[in-house]
């Protein structure tokens, strides 16, 4: 039975409490919610639909696929008014997901039937993609492969961590692009090529898919999946708004990562978000960084550091520097010493997150020894640099950072004849 889900709407997110798990009490649902067909409310167009459609504002018409997921409450209110409804109907716009063969189930919320019908006739739809494949690692990490409406595939990862009190923190690692154009030398994602930017709803739906798979609300979101978020900033910011305002994930629970794209850190700072900026540094000097990150040639290290300092001054939010440790390349104590000197030169509002390299097929890089990792961290700490070592998660699922690629990404377009993964094939960790 299809899961009935609401479009991002803050009043209803609050009304339902645990946002991803609740359906009306009179409706039962099975675990087959992960086998959703593309969520659509489209019905055959009639002559009346064109008039309803033409009344939409240019701002909403720019959403060429007419997707409701990710629209702000103000956009939904505007849409309701343009369809002759009251403002409140925009806020109350609960759109029904369809099951296979277009079977529909109604949730007990007062949305006028006429409004739903007009939306259907005008071609509006929810905007959810089916899960094409799912892999679960021994540590409970789950990688989902979502099939977009243009048959392209994106990956998102759910990372569960249980604290000492037994509470679970669930982090969704989301993609911002289909593939990545930057081709960092140690990263698997760039080897699969680049197709296009993701739309806002295609980012938001990744979080919803993780919630549905784990049957648990997502507590943290990191833009560290496929792609460079700063090259798709408009969609990332719109998705950020939806995740924060509508799905109610705190801004401080959201991290936006970048390898460094000129002028974009300044632009992000101007929005004064309270989210963490994570900069993929990977080297303590420009020469070594260019060897590891080819795109660094267009964005000198000093310029990045200045922009990071300005980001802190603008937002009062500490910057996190991601540093992938590559054995024999950038993992020596001398590199740690040089990194500490660099950071002290530009201020102290920084944190270094060390990431031992995750081996990928065809790469010449090696994972550093535990001793090398410990020595690097100790060298930073002795120089009063705040440091953490990222726990490697999901190696079996090829889901750890730098591993967002599998056999499907080598041929990113899925044939129409390919079947979406069935319920029985999906491994779920609760």
What are these regions (language model features)?
Residues 2-154, 160, 168, 309-317, ...:
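Auxiliary Fe-S-binding modules of radical SAM enzymes
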Residues 134-137, 175-176, 257, 280:
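Short linear Ser/Thr-Pro motifs
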Residues 142, 154, 169-174, 182, ...:
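Generic beta-strand structural signal
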Residues 158-159, 235:
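Residue-level structural signal for beta-strand termini and adjacent loop
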């Amino acid at each position: 039975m299809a899961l009935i889900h609401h479009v991002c709407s803050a009043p209803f997110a609050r009304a339902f409490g645990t946002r991803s798990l609740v359906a009306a009490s009179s409706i039962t649902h099975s675990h087959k919610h992960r086998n959703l067909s593309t969520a659509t409310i489209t019905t055959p167009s009639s002559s009346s639909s064109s008039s309803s459609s033409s009344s939409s504002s240019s701002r909403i018409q720019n959403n060429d696929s007419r997707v409701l997921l990710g629209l702000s409450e103000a956009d939904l209110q505007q849409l309701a008014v343009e369809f002759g409804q009251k403002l409140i109907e925009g806020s109350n716009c609960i759109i029904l997901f369809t099951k296979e063969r277009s079977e529909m189930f109604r949730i007990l919320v007062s949305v006028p039937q006429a409004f739903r019908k007009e939306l259907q006739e005008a071609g509006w739809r929810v905007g959810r993609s089916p899960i094409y494949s799912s892999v679960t690692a021994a540590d409970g990490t789950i990688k989902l492969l979502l099939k977009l409406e243009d048959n392209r595939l994106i990956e998102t990862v759910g990372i569960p961590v249980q604290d000492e009190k037994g509470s679970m923190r669930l982090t969704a690692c989301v993609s911002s692009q289909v593939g990545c154009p930057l081709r960092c030398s140690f990263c698997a994602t760039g080897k699969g090529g680049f197709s296009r930017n993701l739309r806002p709803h295609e980012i938001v739906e990744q979080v919803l898919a993780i919630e549905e798979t784990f049957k648990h609300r997502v507590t943290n979101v990191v833009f560290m999946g496929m792609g460079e978020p700063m090259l798709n900033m408009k969609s990332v910011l719109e998705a950020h708004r939806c995740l924060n305002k509508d799905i109610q994930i705190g801004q401080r629970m959201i991290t936006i990562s970048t390898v460094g794209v000129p002028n974009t850190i300044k632009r992000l700072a101007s929005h004064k978000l309270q989210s963490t900026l994570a900069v993929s540094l990977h080297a303590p000097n420009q020469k070594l960084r260019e060897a590891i990150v080819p795109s660094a040639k267009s964005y000198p290290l000093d310029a990045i550091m200045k922009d990071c300092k300005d980001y802190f001054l603008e937002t009062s939010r500490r910057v996190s520097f991601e540093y992938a440790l590559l054995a024999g390349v950038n993992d020596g104590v001398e590199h740690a010493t040089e990194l500490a000197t660099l950071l002290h030169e530009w201020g102290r509002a920084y944190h270094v997150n060390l990431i031992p390299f995750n081996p990928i097929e065809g790469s010449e890089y090696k994972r550093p020894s535990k001793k090398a990792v410990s020595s690097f961290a100790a060298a930073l700490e002795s120089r009063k640099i705040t440091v953490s070592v990222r726990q490697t998660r999901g190696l079996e699922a090829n889901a750890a950072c730098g591993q967002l690629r599998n056999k499907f990404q080598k041929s990113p377009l899925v044939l129409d004849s390919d079947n979406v993964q069935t319920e029985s094939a999906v491994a779920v960790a609760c």
